[in-house]
Amino acid sequence: MNVVGYGGGTDSTAMLVGLWRHHVPVDLILFADPGAEQPHTYAYLDTMSRWLENHGMPAITRVWYTEKNGQRLTLEQECLRSGTLPSIAYGYKKCSLKHKVAPQEKFCRHYQPCIDAWEKGEKVVKFIGYDAGEERRLLNALPHDLQDKKYQKEYPLMEWGWSRKDCIQAIRDAGLPLPGKSSCFFCPSMKR
């Protein structure tokens, strides 16, 4: 069972293109929607969905954070409710964990092919789109990855040696426009 966490940006788009080019099977593509992505990211989902369909890959499944009562809670609603900025403004990544990682994990916990893999004692392969210039991110993730009993994390862009420049070229070679920076429109760490 192979799962892609798709963020709608350059790295994860290039990763999907590369997985297709390398004939790596993809069973599930998840986009965790915090409800506050840049408008161009939402528009790009349609572009990428058409490309995926034309290349025989699965559709993008959108997931989001829900409260215990089942109601969707966007990151913006959470910030307005608490009267604070996103946690990244204070040096934490709680917003990504809560609104990106947790909804994907919750979906997989209830997704029968993942359940079947775990019941057989297998790990679900989760592809992460860190390009070859992001070794620090990989090193930070490794201790958690090694302890993870449910997922085998793989970093194909690093495995292929794809730099940011290579990712951009792969997207262009696939006939796709560049996606633009994906981030919440009010993220304090957003770069231009």
What are these regions (language model features)?
Residues 1-192:
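Nucleotide-activated chemistry modules centered on ATP-dependent adenylation/adenylyltransferase
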